[in-house]
Amino acid sequence: MEKSWFNLMFSKGELESRGELSKAMDSFAPSEKTTISQDRFIYDMDKNFYGWGERSSYSNNVDLLVSSKDIRNFISDDTFFVRDSNKNSYSIYFDIKKKFFEIDNDFSDLEIFFYNYCSSSYLNNRSKGDNDLHYDPYIKDTKYNCTNHINSCIDSYFRSHICIDSNFLSNSKNSNESYIYNFICSESGKIRESKNYKIRTNRNRSNLISSKDFDITQNYNQLWIQCDNCYGLMYKKVKMNVCEQCGHYLKMSSSERIELSIDPGTWNPMDEDMVSADPIKFHSKEEPYKNRIDSAQKTTGLTDAVQTGTGQLNGIPVALGVMDFQFMGGSMGSVVGEKITRLIEYATNQCLPLILVCSSGGARMQEGSLSLMQMAKISSVLCDYQSSKKLFYISILTSPTTGGVTASFGMLGDIIIAEPYAYIAFAGKRVIEQTLKKAVPDGSQAAESLLRKGLLDAIVPRNLLKGVLRELFQLHAFFPLNKN
């Protein structure tokens, strides 16, 4: 029987780990003198000693002691000596082949906890849909399974004896990584001296006290965003919600688009107090229309699915309307139609260039024919703006732009610009396939396909959009108020 030392200190004050892990991950030595030689411990490490973070689902930036595929090389007959905060040492012995697990009598409650865990329905009756943090996709592999449950047992035992603030890991994508490993290993894989982390036991019924570093992370986590295509993290204020790893364009709120396009301090919103009054008393078994409106208003901070107003773009006065897909899918109801109509009429009277940023699923079904009439109403005032006054209208199509918006003002711009990879269509792919019983080719409703067919004038990346708009306005004799 070969024995290994693993010094892990849990105190009421600081969480300490006394050991260092080299960059090559080939040595691990205890800080105190023990009866086991350092060479023996290195020998055990060379046999792929497995760390606490075995079930991490997001370990691309974390160097584990051994990867999941090497778990089969785990020592099948091994004893670990563990010391707690009270300087009490006890042994953990297990045999993977025989599924045998034994704890020193000084900590017999851990042994009872393990056997209760293994005898429960978790071992044999779990499925992937149970949302179980300990679900093992290799449940049929005995060695892998047994090792998983040994680690789960030890992990769960310490969880039950240490109070953790649930908000501490709420914003982390690694929340299902082993709890102990999260607090010991940093992203570089080295053991870190966690002088700022304070843990109190259940005796005082207190929560985890996080460090100042984590307070800062909580305060500024809105500055970071995760790509829904490759799951990479990016600083969204710099990258404009465009993934720097895969180039995927993420959705932007209307406020973010206004901030991107309009000069700071020049935005003047219009008709902010206009709200829908449920004109046809729409009845829904799932959720009343007014409740959905209230919920969307609380979520987005907007009164409806569009923001309208005036501002300056590189010093050039413009009228701007920006739709927000987060508000009921950017659907166009009577309020959206009225706000856009008033914006166009104001731009007509003031002889301002007009920009409408479209992001919508189409007409709002909860308002029936009133929502459909907004298509004709907006198109009518646009006709006067473009034909009678000879003013300049730019339509910007973002993903997704579909339905009634595409069939009306979305495609009426003097210049029609789309974002890269934007989904633009009148009827969605699913609707077409169900109606015509024909498959819709992939990419046929993407901006690049529409550009090749002549339905768009240009596809402009976000970082170049403001400069392109400035040049278009100057080409049509719209210049900054103050030339510097």
From Swiss-Prot:
Gene3D superfamilies: 2-enoyl-CoA Hydratase, Chain A, domain 1
Primary localization: plastid
Superkingdom to which the source organism belongs: Eukaryota
Pathway entry: Lipid metabolism; malonyl-CoA biosynthesis; malonyl-CoA from acetyl-CoA: step 1/1
Swiss-Prot/TrEMBL GO biological process terms: fatty acid biosynthetic process; malonyl-CoA biosynthetic process
The protein's required cofactors: Zn(2+)
Gene Ontology MF, one: carboxyl- or carbamoyltransferase activity
Pfam families listed in its UniProt record: Carboxyl_trans
Signal peptide: none
ZnF region ranges: C4-type: 227-246
Cofactor info, note text: Binds 1 zinc ion per subunit.
Residues noted as binding Zn(2+) in the record, renumbered to the chain: 227, 230, 243, 246
Leading EC class: transferase
Keywords per UniProt: ATP-binding, Chloroplast, Fatty acid biosynthesis, Fatty acid metabolism, Lipid biosynthesis, Lipid metabolism, Metal-binding, Nucleotide-binding, Plastid, Transferase, Zinc, Zinc-finger
Record-linked InterPro entries: AcCoA_carboxyl_beta, Acetyl_CoA_COase_Trfase_b_su, ClpP/crotonase-like_dom_sf, COA_CT_N
Catalytic activity: N(6)-carboxybiotinyl-L-lysyl-[protein] + acetyl-CoA = N(6)-biotinyl-L-lysyl-[protein] + malonyl-CoA
Record EC number: 2.1.3.15
Protein localization: Plastid, Chloroplast stroma
Annotated CoA carboxyltransferase N-terminal domain residues: 223-484
PANTHER family in the record: ACETYL-COENZYME A CARBOXYLASE CARBOXYL TRANSFERASE SUBUNIT BETA, CHLOROPLASTIC (PTHR42995:SF5)
Described purpose of this protein according to its UniProt entry: Component of the acetyl coenzyme A carboxylase (ACC) complex. Biotin carboxylase (BC) catalyzes the carboxylation of biotin on its carrier protein (BCCP) and then the CO(2) group is transferred by the transcarboxylase to acetyl-CoA to form malonyl-CoA.
Subunit structure, interactors included: Acetyl-CoA carboxylase is a heterohexamer composed of biotin carboxyl carrier protein, biotin carboxylase and 2 subunits each of ACCase subunit alpha and ACCase plastid-coded subunit beta (accD).
UniProt record similarity statement: Belongs to the AccD/PCCB family.
Name under which the protein is recorded: Acetyl-coenzyme A carboxylase carboxyl transferase subunit beta, chloroplastic
Species this protein is from: Crucihimalaya wallichii
